[in-house]
């Protein structure tokens, strides 16, 4: 158990002794007794002792009231300090909540960026890498050059065949003309002897 404070001891004693009710009545009785004792001129020791006893009780009651007042002041100061501490704790809690909200928003952005990055990485992984793509492009370029060279060769051969075919057609035409001319000459030569024999 913790140590008992002075305030707690005083509070318990005050609860045992009472809350000071009837002090005004006790003071009034003391004043009346004192006035009566003064006016009577009596020197009775018992009456004097009773007044001293009442005075002591009044002094004790006043001291008790002062103690209660001081204790209340200390409690008020303590409550004020607790209130300030609570206000500071609430303000710190609000700042912490605001900071946590910022951290949550940042975490959400990071998570979103990571998800977008993962999705983009999956798309990239579905395509060949740069080195492989360059190799394929080089192979296609090489094949295209070979096809272009083959096309040029075929076109050259086709042009050569076209020229040769043209020469062949010209030769055939000339040969045909020559044959026709030979046929005409042969016919003319056959007709000439017959004309000579008829006269």
Curated annotation (Swiss-Prot):
Subcellular location: Cytoplasm; Nucleus; Nucleus speckle
Keyword Coiled coil in record: yes
Keywords, sorted A to Z: Coiled coil, Cytoplasm, mRNA processing, mRNA splicing, mRNA transport, Nucleus, RNA-binding, Transport
Record-linked Pfam families: THOC7
Keyword set includes Transport: yes
Any single GO CC term annotated in Swiss-Prot or TrEMBL for this entry: cytoplasm
Biological process annotations from GO: mRNA processing; mRNA transport; RNA splicing
Molecular function GO labels: RNA binding
Coiled-coil intervals, chain numbering: 73-192
Primary residence: cytoplasm
Protein family per UniProt: Belongs to the THOC7 family.
Cited function: Component of the THO subcomplex of the TREX complex which is thought to couple mRNA transcription, processing and nuclear export, and which specifically associates with spliced mRNA and not with unspliced pre-mRNA. Required for efficient export of polyadenylated RNA. Plays a key structural role in the oligomerization of the THO-DDX39B complex.
Quaternary structure note: Component of the THO subcomplex, which is composed of thoc1, thoc2, thoc3, thoc5, thoc6 and thoc7. Component of the transcription/export (TREX) complex at least composed of alyref/thoc4, ddx39b, sarnp/cip29, chtop and the THO subcomplex.
Protein's name in the database: THO complex subunit 7 homolog
Origin species: Xenopus tropicalis (Western clawed frog)
């Amino acid at each position: 158990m913790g140590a008992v404070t002075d305030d707690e001891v005083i509070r318990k004693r005050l609860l045992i002794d009472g809350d000071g009710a009837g002090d005004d009545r006790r003071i009034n009785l003391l004043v009346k007794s004192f006035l009566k004792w003064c006016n009577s001129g009596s020197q009775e020791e018992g009456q004097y002792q009773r007044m001293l006893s009442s005075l002591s009780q009044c002094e004790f009651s006043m001291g008790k009231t002062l103690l209660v007042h001081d204790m209340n002041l200390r409690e008020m100061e303590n409550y004020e300090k607790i209130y300030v501490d609570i206000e500071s704790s609430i303000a710190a809690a609000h700042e912490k909540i605001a900071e946590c909200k910022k951290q949550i928003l940042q975490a959400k952005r990071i998570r979103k960026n990571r998800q977008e990055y993962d999705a983009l990485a999956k798309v990239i992984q579905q395509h060949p890498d740069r080195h492989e793509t360059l190799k394929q492009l080089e192979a296609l370029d090489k094949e295209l050059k070979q096809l272009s060279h083959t096309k040029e060769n075929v076109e050259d051969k086709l042009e050569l065949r076209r020229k040769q075919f043209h020469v062949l057609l010209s030769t055939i035409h000339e040969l045909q003309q020559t044959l026709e001319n030979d046929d005409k000459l042969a016919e003319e030569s056959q007709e000439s002897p017959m004309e000579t024999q008829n006269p």
